[in-house]
């Protein structure tokens, strides 16, 4: 893998370990086709075109390795270098992906974690994530809260507001130096509490007292979870095509 002189390698870890039960489809949702193309390919093509991304690792649901290989070859994606097996949660999939990268990256190389079913990500979001990580040591794509917020008293009602200025949405990409992030996971694994935490990388780092730095986000950068999200993404692609822009 080519390396820039002096600089770190920028590697994207794409999480594709889910099965998409909420979608009710016959295939994992990352393989559902939108305008004839699998969602994961829409996402990978953005990384393929981005000049700052050097390589891609896909952390994949078991049993779909041959399908991934076939469509990566079909669409000529050269940056996909590695495939690791996904885990049952976000954080365990990340850990599997990190362990697979041992010996392939240096401790100072950059790992940008993103979801395979979040194809709305843009070049400016990716580039700001990498910039902030290199300056501060990590970055989390931020989605500020725009709605009025309230806390749950129970499942039926709320009696208290929450100041939206005090909270924010933590989205992907989430970007880190490889060695430091792997060390955080290994400490938690050895301590026996990795699976006791809320299953996200941000929860682990908060538990370790880390300060997380915000990078650029977008209200449009959503994870495709249900059929409404699929319709939204298809409409977005068609709109861009009508403008003569890359569909995604």
Feature locations, PLM:
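Hydrophobic helical membrane-anchoring modules
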Residues: 221-248
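Acidic metal-phosphate-binding loop of nucleotide-sugar-dependent transferases
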Residues: 21, 116-120
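N-terminal glycine-rich phosphate-binding loop and ensuing alpha1 helix
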Residues: 2-66
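Residue-level signal for inorganic ion chemistry
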Residues: 14, 40, 97, 115, ...
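Short phosphate-binding loop-to-helix
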Residues: 73-109
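Conserved core of the sugar-phosphate nucleotidyltransferase
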Residues: 120-215, 248
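Hydrophobic C-terminal alpha-helix "anchor/cap" residues
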Residues: 44-48, 72, 101
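Short aromatic-hydrophobic micro-motifs that form the base-stacking/packing surface
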Residues: 110-114
């Amino acid at each position: 893998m080519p390396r820039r002189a002096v600089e770190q390698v920028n590697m994207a870890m794409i999480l594709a370990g889910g099965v998409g039960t909420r979608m009710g489809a016959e295939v994992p949702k990352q393989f559902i086709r939108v305008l004839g193309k699998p969602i994961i390919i829409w996402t990978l093509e953005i990384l393929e075109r981005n000049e700052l991304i050097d390589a891609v690792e896909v952390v994949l649901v078991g049993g779909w390795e041959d399908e991934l290989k076939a469509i990566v070859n079909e669409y000529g994606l050269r940056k996909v270098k590695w495939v690791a097996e996904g885990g049952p949660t976000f954080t365990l999939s990340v850990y599997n992906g990190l362990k697979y990268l041992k010996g392939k990256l240096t401790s100072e190389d950059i790992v940008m974690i993103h979801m395979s079913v979040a194809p709305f990500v843009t070049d400016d979001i990716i580039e700001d994530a990498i910039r902030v990580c290199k300056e501060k040591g990590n970055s989390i794509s931020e989605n500020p809260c725009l709605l009025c917020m309230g806390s749950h008293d129970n499942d039926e009602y709320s009696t208290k507001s929450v100041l939206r200025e005090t909270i924010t949405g933590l989205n992907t990409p989430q970007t880190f130096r490889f060695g430091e992030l792997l060390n955080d996971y290994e400490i938690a694994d050895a301590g026996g509490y990795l699976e006791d935490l809320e299953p996200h990388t941000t929860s682990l780092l908060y538990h370790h007292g880390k300060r997380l730095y915000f990078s650029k986000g977008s209200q449009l950068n959503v994870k495709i979870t249900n059929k409404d999200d699929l319709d939204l993404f298809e409409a977005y692609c068609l709109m861009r095509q009508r403008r003569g822009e890359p569909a995604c």
